[in-house]
Every structure is written in C-alpha cells, then in structure tokens.
C-alpha cells in the first residue's frame, strides 16, 4: 500500500512539474524578441513541442534590406538540459529528433535553412544566400534562445546540414560547446577531384566493372530504354524543360555510380544476365531516379545548386570514356552537377573553402565527424588531424543514410561518449 502511494506521489509530482515547465516556457517564449510560436503535438519523451517562426534580416549587416521568417521547431526536455541546434541543409516541413539529441537527452531547436521551404524572403535575391548570412541566422537564434537555455549548447547536422554546422562553428566558434557533423562534406574546389578518385577505388574492381558495364548497357540501348523512361516520367508526372528528357537520362546514367555508393547498394543486385530494357529501367530508377533531374526537383534544389556553384563546391561527371554514347552531355569537359535557378550565371569564389580547410585541422576543436566508408561523400570528408581536440569516425561498411552513432561498435561508441562527457561536463547514460 505504501509503495503504491509512493508511486502515485512520484507520478503526480512529475505531472505537475511538466505542467509547470510548460507554463513557464510559454511565458518565456512570449518574452523573446521576434519569435512567433505555436504549440504542436508533443514529441515523445519531451515536455513540450513548438513550431517557431523567427524574424531574420535578409542581410545581417543591413537591416534595411528587409526580413523573412525562418521556420524552426523547439522540443523542450528541461531547462537544466543541454540544447542541440540541428542545422538543416534544406527545407524541413515536419519535426524530427536528431540521434544526438536523444543520445544526450537534450532540448532541440531544429532549424530550416534560409531560402528553402517556408524560410523564404518575399523576393529571392541570391546575393544574400551566402554561408556568412546562413550562419548569421543560426547565431541570431542561438543568441535569442540562450535567454531560456543557459546550459551547454551543441550543434549538429546531416550531409549538407552537417557541413552547415561546420561553417557555423567557423564563423561563430563560441556559440556552441560541441559540434557533431554527420556525413557532411567540406569540398576543396568547384569540382572536387577527390570524388573521382573515390569512385575509381571504392569497393572491388569486379563491382566497379559491373557498374560501368551497366552504364554502357543503358547508353547503348537508349533507343529501347528512352520510351520506357518517358512512360515512367509521364506516370510520375515529371516535366523536363530545364533539361530535355534525353539529357536528363544521360545525367542520371552518369550519376548512377555516385548514388550507388552514396547509399550502399548491393553489387549482387546489378542486373547483368538476360537483361531486358524493362528490367534495366526498373532497377536503374531505384538507384538513380531520373526525377532528380526533372523541373520540379531542379527548382526545389535551386538554392542548394546556387550555394554549390558559388561557395560550397561540388562535383561533376567524368564523361570522356563514354564518347560516342552521349548525345547531350559533353565528353570534352566534365559536366558539372549544379543546375542554377533559371540557368543564371554565378561565379565561384574559393576563398571560404580555402579558409575553412585551413581552420579545421588547426582550430576545429570539440568537433565530432562521423562518416561511412562506402559513402561517396566520404571522399570529401574533413581529413583527420592530430593538432585538434576532435574525433573522427569512419564506420566500416556504412553509407550516407546509416553512418550514425547507433551503427558504431561498442568501442567507438564508448570513445564518443567519453569525449562528449568531457566536453559537456555531463554524465551520459545510454545503457
């Protein structure tokens, strides 16, 4: 009886504490400048969840240039917990909780990237889509929410979001105590040559030969395959005016090796025997979908392509060996994989890449880099350095979609946990 009473009292106390935290948090949010918030369904294992709209200047150095509202999501665990900023690289139409947030049992602010989704100015002036402005958005959010969360702060992101976390740390090294970069590349040029070396050496020669043979099959049998691609595109309601259908198809064939390794597809699944055009297209679209080169997706990733063409750097396609098989793509120079909005012209400036590639190995402390050995983007991973207090994990056999803490060995996970506990001065219990 006493035990039941004690349990009842504890449950009641926790319930009342949760209600009190929600009420206090509502009050504190009302007091924040330039933040509009709406309560949404509470995320599991959190006390409260909100969708936010945060007023941001288009130009952080000149408020007269106008403003926009940046979409974000707040998941509240407790005022005494660390806070994780999850930096997205693209749009974020719905909430998600990062692995890192769950791992340390923290609060989370999930932030949609400027010029994506609903985080758009009334008119898109791409002159203000720079990493300095992007990280200025993050700094402003950090400054505002530090009025509520006064414990340790972390930032994390996946892929382009991971790279954004690193650029944020470069521009504002004191905003967070720890950064965790998942599979985020830091390129070194407009066309990073390391991608080609990776694709020429990853896996086994037999597998790479199968990939190449399949590409050649697709191109040699274009007459039979293109009608199937057209039928597939009509069914999927895809439009091709930025690229015509044949050009989009050739791009998708060139993209195939990159996509194959990026997401760790199985060499045994590459169709080679008794191959029919229908079988080829069915498999091909499951790995390198032509929709990626359709008008809708080219437009949807327009801001990403602009960033890649001006500051981030990116990759291209080595086409010389396919001379005679490509009609739409050049085989005299490598076609680049950036497709700028409205086919606008933009100049690449290598200055920032040079700066961050110098800064990371010398001053990139308290950063954890997590990559998968199969992932094509591991080719442009931040190189390990003994000159900084940082950690690198290249998880064997993992790719862009599953190189995560949960995929680590017990030894790797213990190493990561020890570093986080040391840097954050907390105890992490994930038994």
Model feature map: region roles:
Residues 102-121:
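Conserved alpha/beta-hydrolase
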Residues 176-236:
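A catalytic-pocket lid/entrance helix-loop region that shapes and gates access to the active site
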Residues 128-147:
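Alpha/beta-hydrolase active-site loop
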Residues 162-174, 179, 186:
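Short glycine-enriched nucleophile-adjacent loop
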Residues 233-348:
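Alpha/beta-hydrolase fold active-site neighborhood
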Residues 149-159:
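Alpha/beta-hydrolase fold nucleophile elbow
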């Amino acid at each position: 009886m006493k035990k039941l009473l004690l349990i009842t009292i504890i449950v009641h106390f926790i319930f009342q504490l949760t209600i009190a935290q929600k009420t206090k948090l509502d009050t504190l949010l009302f007091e924040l400048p330039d933040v509009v918030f709406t309560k949404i369904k509470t995320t599991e294992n959190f006390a409260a969840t909100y969708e936010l709209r945060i007023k941001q200047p288009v130009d952080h150095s000149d408020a007269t240039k106008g403003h926009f509202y940046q979409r974000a999501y707040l998941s509240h665990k407790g005022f005494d917990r660390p806070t994780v900023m999850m930096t997205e690289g693209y749009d974020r139409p719905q909430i998600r909780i990062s692995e890192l947030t769950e791992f340390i049992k923290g609060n989370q602010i999930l932030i949609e990237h400027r010029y994506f989704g609903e985080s758009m100015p009334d008119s898109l002036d791409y002159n203000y889509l720079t990493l300095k402005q992007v990280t200025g958005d993050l700094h402003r959010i950090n400054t505002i929410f530090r009025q509520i969360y006064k414990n340790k702060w972390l930032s994390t992101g996946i892929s382009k979001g991971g790279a954004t976390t690193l650029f944020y740390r470069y521009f504002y090294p004191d905003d967070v105590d720890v950064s965790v970069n998942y599979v985020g590349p830091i390129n070194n040029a407009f066309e990073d040559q390391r991608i080609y070396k990776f694709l020429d050496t990853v896996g086994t020669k037999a597998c790479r030969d199968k990939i190449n043979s399949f590409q050649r099959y697709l191109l040699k049998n274009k007459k039979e395959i293109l009608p199937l691609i057209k039928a597939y595109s009509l069914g999927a309601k895809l439009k091709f005016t930025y690229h015509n259908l044949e050009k989009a198809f050739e791009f998708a064939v060139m993209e195939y090796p990159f996509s194959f390794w990026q997401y760790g597809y199985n060499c045994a699944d590459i169709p080679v025997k008794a191959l029919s055009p229908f079988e080829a297209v069915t498999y091909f679209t499951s790995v390198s979908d032509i929709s990626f080169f359709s008008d809708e997706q080219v437009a949807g990733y327009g801001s990403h392509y602009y960033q890649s063409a001006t500051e981030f750097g990116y990759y291209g396609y080595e086409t010389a060996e396919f001379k005679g098989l490509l009609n739409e793509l050049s085989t005299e120079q490598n076609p680049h994989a950036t497709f700028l909005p409205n086919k606008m012209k933009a100049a690449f400036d290598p200055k920032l890449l040079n700066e961050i590639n110098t800064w990371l190995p010398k001053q990139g402390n308290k950063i954890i880099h997590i990559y998968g050995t199969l992932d094509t983007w591991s080719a442009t991973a931040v190189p390990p350095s003994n000159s900084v207090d940082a950690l690198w994990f290249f998880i064997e056999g993992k790719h862009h979609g599953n190189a995560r803490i949960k995929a680590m060995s017990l030894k790797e996970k213990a190493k990561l946990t020890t570093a986080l506990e040391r840097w954050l001065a907390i105890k992490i219990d994930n038994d």
